[in-house]
Amino acid sequence: MQEALVSPVRSALELKPFNFGDQRLASSPRYLPSGDDALYRCSSPFSPSFGFSSPSPLATSVSLSPSSSASLVDDGDDGGAAADATGQRLQLARLALQYQEVADRYELCLSHLAEAAEEAAALRLENAELRVTNSDLALRLALLSGKHTAAVAVADEIRRLRLGEQKVAAATKERTPEKLAVLPKSISVRSTSYLKLNQQSQAATATSAAPNRKPRTSSNPTNPPNSQRAYDGGKKGDEQKAQPADSGAELEVYNQGMFKTELCNKWEETGDCPYGDQCQFAHGVTELRPVIRHPRYKTAVCRMVLAGDVCPYGHRCHFRHSLTPAERLLLRS
């Protein structure tokens, strides 16, 4: 807009070519709207406007009307003010949104803080209950440890006095009467016929032509070849036959290690045997067959037990493992 206003002024101030001679008479008289003579437009070498033309009417009108330029400036100022107001409103809207976001975050933080406070209160209550429970348990443990210590002290005193050992042994026997009475490892019969059978077996071994003989018999328990009849008593078999029937018992006995002469360990522990009917050992007392023994079987004490050691033969040992009170005194000394 300023370029449009300045361009007529520049065009009015442009230099015109120099005109020789006086052209005031040649030009027709023209009157300006303001009443001035047209001679003022003539160019003379002696006039003040030598070489310059008079300002054009457009330039005069522009230069003499400051109200139009002022109105244009006012319009520009109004547009800038409107733009500034719009920017301020946008800035205020952004600030309002940021404030709302900050307020929402503040409320969220307050809710989280309230939840954390509730959890802390619950944990404090739980810790208080746990402390009470721990103190109660500690008190009970202290009481139990005191009682146990007192019981151990009393037991040590009784052990030092060597009292109640026989009672303890009797109580142990009473706790497992079924295993000792109902489930024996074997049924032993002491008989004097054992010596005669042993001599006969030694003679048969010396005269036998077969070098190898199986230690066990066949699995047929109804008619075993090595079964013998013995009399349970202190006299010989011939004398037992002459006595009445109620003076002694006639039994069918077998040698140690034969079929069904010992109780099956697997059956005794679990009540079942993987071999079933083919097992060489007895599955119960009803299947046990008596074994003939030496007359002095289990009459002398085992030297390993008397020395305080463990006998490696176990229940198969031919010597006695139970000690009498006199033997216990000898063992302690």
From Swiss-Prot:
SMART domains: ZnF_C3H1
Superkingdom assignment: Eukaryota
Zinc finger residue extent: C3H1-type: 258-286, 296-324
Organismal lineage: Eukaryota, Viridiplantae, Streptophyta, Embryophyta, Tracheophyta
Coiled-coil regions listed in the entry: 110-138
Feature: compositional bias, Low complexity: 199-210, 217-227
Name under which the protein is recorded: Zinc finger CCCH domain-containing protein 9
Pfam families xref list: zf-CCCH
Keywords: Coiled coil, DNA-binding, Metal-binding, Repeat, Zinc, Zinc-finger
UniProt-listed InterPro entries: ZFP36-like, Znf_CCCH, Znf_CCCH_sf
GO MF term set: DNA binding; mRNA binding; zinc ion binding
UniProt feature, compositional bias: Basic and acidic residues: 232-241
UniProt organism field: Oryza sativa subsp. japonica
Annotated stretches, region: Disordered: 198-249
